[in-house]
């Protein structure tokens, strides 16, 4: 059995994620209260405005303990939370270029440096290979705080490499989508990633391997029009906003007010766009069970 050592403690793949130390996250033990205290930094829930300690919200997988609102997770934190054990990170050799010498209110390279400084990531997609409930798989997650999780050439490169590795090692690929769409600063090159990622997904299907998409808040544009809607199974987190054009753009076009829950996960479930809505606390076991069924694993 594979084991990993963190903070001087030996952990097996079956160790509950609440007992593991996630890089960059201070994990609370079960005795710690989920209520805010005066001695710890707090986060205000955007839904119920409750103040929750950073320790408590991390312990609760970034779900508000007061109202159950699903807060946004950073890509790296999500993948480390998702896997029992991370074996490798993929795609770090890819780095963004500026072939168009694109300048809007500031040069593209400057925007990239700002995004890297803000998130600590080199690009908007993080890819890891690991095990979940003793099943090896590959998972990728979009970092929405990196230029809105936009898809450029490096995101395409990393996704395609993840799919190719999954085919090579006969493993499932999981994608946690959270994106505003294609990256305008790369023009047609970013739009080409829609075709590249779609072709990579088709190769996975030809190989008989599962591709599962978890739609988190929000998913829009070219990512929705490609890799986010080509899964064998589509899972959404509660209340996630999912669409192609944004709600305001549609309202301005059709000159009508679109009432809630338009474009919410619940609306899409009612209209057959997603297969199920899964609470974040049940997500790991749900994905593990689906992968095991689709791959005929015990």
Curated annotation (Swiss-Prot):
GO terms for molecular function: acetyl-CoA carboxylase activity; ATP binding; carboxyl- or carbamoyltransferase activity; zinc ion binding. Disulfide bonds: none annotated. NCBIfam families: accD. A zinc finger (C4-type) spans 45-67. Keywords: ATP-binding, Cytoplasm, Fatty acid biosynthesis, Fatty acid metabolism, Lipid biosynthesis, Lipid metabolism, Metal-binding, Nucleotide-binding, Transferase, Zinc, Zinc-finger. InterPro entries: AcCoA_carboxyl_beta, Acetyl_CoA_COase_Trfase_b_su, ClpP/crotonase-like_dom_sf, COA_CT_N. Its EC number is 2.1.3.15. Acetyl-CoA carboxylase is a heterohexamer composed of biotin carboxyl carrier protein (AccB), biotin carboxylase (AccC) and two subunits each of ACCase subunit alpha (AccA) and ACCase subunit beta (AccD). The lineage of its organism: Bacteria, Pseudomonadati, Pseudomonadota, Gammaproteobacteria, Moraxellales. Pathway: Lipid metabolism; malonyl-CoA biosynthesis; malonyl-CoA from acetyl-CoA: step 1/1. Zn(2+) binds at residues 45, 48, 64, 67. It is found in: Cytoplasm. It catalyses: N(6)-carboxybiotinyl-L-lysyl-[protein] + acetyl-CoA = N(6)-biotinyl-L-lysyl-[protein] + malonyl-CoA. This is Acetyl-coenzyme A carboxylase carboxyl transferase subunit beta. Belongs to the AccD/PCCB family. It comes from the Bacteria. GO terms for biological process: fatty acid biosynthetic process; malonyl-CoA biosynthetic process.
């Amino acid at each position: 059995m594979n084991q990993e050592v963190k903070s001087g403690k030996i952990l097996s793949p079956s160790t509950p994620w609440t007992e593991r130390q996630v890089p960059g996250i201070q994990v609370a033990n079960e005795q710690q209260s989920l209520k805010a205290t005066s001695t710890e930094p707090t986060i205000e829930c955007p839904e119920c405005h409750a103040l929750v300690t950073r320790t408590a919200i991390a312990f609760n997988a970034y779900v508000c303990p007061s109202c159950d609102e699903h807060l946004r997770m950073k890509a790296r934190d999500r993948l480390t939370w998702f896997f029992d054990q991370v074996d490798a990170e993929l795609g770090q050799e890819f780095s963004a270029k500026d072939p168009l010498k694109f300048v809007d209110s500031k040069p593209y390279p400057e925007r990239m440096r700002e995004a890297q400084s803000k998130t600590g990531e080199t690009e908007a997609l993080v890819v890891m290979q690991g095990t979940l409930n003793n099943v090896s798989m590959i998972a990728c997650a979009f970092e929405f705080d990196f230029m809105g999780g936009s898809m450029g050439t490096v995101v395409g490169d990393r996704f395609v490499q993840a799919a190719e590795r999954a085919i090579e090692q006969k493993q499932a690929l999981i994608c946690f989508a959270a994106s505003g769409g294609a990256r305008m600063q790369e023009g047609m090159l970013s739009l080409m990633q829609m075709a590249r990622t779609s072709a990579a997904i088709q190769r996975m299907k030809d190989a008989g391997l599962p591709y599962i998409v978890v739609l988190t808040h929000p998913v829009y544009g070219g990512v929705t029009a490609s890799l986010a809607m080509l899964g064998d199974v589509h899972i959404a987190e509660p209340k996630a906003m999912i669409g192609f054009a944004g709600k305001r753009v549609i309202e301005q076009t059709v000159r009508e007010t679109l009432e809630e829950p338009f474009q919410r996960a619940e609306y899409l479930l009612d209209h057959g766009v997603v297969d199920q809505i899964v609470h974040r606390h049940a997500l790991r076991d749900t994905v593990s069970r689906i992968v095991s069924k689709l791959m005929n694993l015990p």
